[in-house]
């Protein structure tokens, strides 16, 4: 399901048998209709970014709900897929902040310790937030609580009102929070553009004696 260390830590914040409930939910959801991402990618964020290597969290709300977009990493799409509006704005801010990045797959961020997590890990095709409030929030809240317990600093990048509510789980003074409006077209001009989250994250990591992220990779 997830990287084994993630699995053990997350379980400690969940009711007994919650993983069984998740598997039952997934069985029913994927049997009853088209759901994104592909089932094998539901836990991809936790599989490609081990807990011990995580130093940044970028929290999304739920996966893209269009064909072939969602790949299990928040905001990321496969390279051959056109960038959705929020990702276009993320890359625009990155270009203004650090430099241009012309590819849409953010897997190279994940491999450097950037956990690209959505609060909901699945979505019905064409129905934004269609699985919100059903199963995922206790699980992904537990992921944030696990990160909060880390001894090494983590930079939490929280875009938009939904993500910013998760600050309640970030109580360890070792960690850092970067927050702004969401990169969606509705709110990007209300403070997302110009917020410089990428250079600010690297400045924090380097001040903490950690290696910065190569955001252009």
From Swiss-Prot:
One record GO biological process: base-excision repair, AP site formation via deaminated base removal
Catalytic machinery residues: 62 (proton acceptor)
Xref: InterPro entries: UDG_fam1, Ura-DNA_Glyclase_AS, Uracil-DNA_glycosylase-like, Uracil-DNA_glycosylase-like_sf
Signal peptide residues on this chain, from the entry's feature table: none
Name this protein carries in UniProt: Uracil-DNA glycosylase
SUPFAM superfamilies in UniProt: Uracil-DNA glycosylase-like
Disulphide bridges: none
Compartment list: Cytoplasm
Catalytic activity: Hydrolyzes single-stranded DNA or mismatched double-stranded DNA and polynucleotides, releasing free uracil
Pfam families membership: UDG (PF03167)
One Gene Ontology term of the molecular function aspect: uracil DNA N-glycosylase activity
Main localization (coarse): cytoplasm
Claim: Magnesium is one of the keywords in the record: no
Protein's job: Excises uracil residues from the DNA which can arise as a result of misincorporation of dUMP residues by DNA polymerase or due to deamination of cytosine.
Family of the protein in this entry: Belongs to the uracil-DNA glycosylase (UDG) superfamily. UNG family.
Keyword Methyltransferase annotated: no
EC number of the protein: 3.2.2.27
GO cellular component: cytoplasm
Annotated keywords: Cytoplasm, DNA damage, DNA repair, Hydrolase
């Amino acid at each position: 399901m997830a990287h084994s260390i993630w699995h053990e830590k997350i379980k400690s914040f969940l009711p007994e048998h919650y993983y069984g409930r998740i598997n039952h939910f997934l069985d029913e959801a994927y049997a009853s209709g088209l759901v994104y991402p592909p089932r094998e990618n539901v836990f991809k964020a936790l599989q490609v970014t081990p807990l011990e290597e995580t130093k940044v969290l970028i929290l999304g709300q739920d996966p893209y709900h269009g064909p072939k977009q969602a790949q299990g990493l928040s905001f990321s799409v496969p390279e051959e897929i056109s960038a959705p509006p929020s990702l276009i704005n993320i890359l625009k801010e990155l270009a203004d902040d650090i430099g241009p990045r012309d590819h849409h797959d953010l897997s190279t961020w994940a491999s450097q310790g950037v956990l690209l997590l959505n609060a909901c890990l699945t979505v019905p095709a064409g129905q934004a937030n269609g699985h919100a409030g059903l199963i995922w929030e206790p699980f992904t809240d537990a992921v944030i609580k696990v990160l909060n317990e880390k001894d090494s600093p983590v930079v939490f990048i929280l875009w938009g009102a939904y993500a910013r509510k998760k600050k309640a789980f970030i109580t360890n003074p070792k960690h850092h929070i970067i927050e702004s409006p969401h990169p969606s077209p509705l709110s990007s001009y209300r403070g997302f553009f110009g917020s410089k989250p990428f250079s600010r994250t690297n400045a924090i990591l380097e001040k903490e004696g950690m290696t910065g992220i190569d955001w252009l990779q």
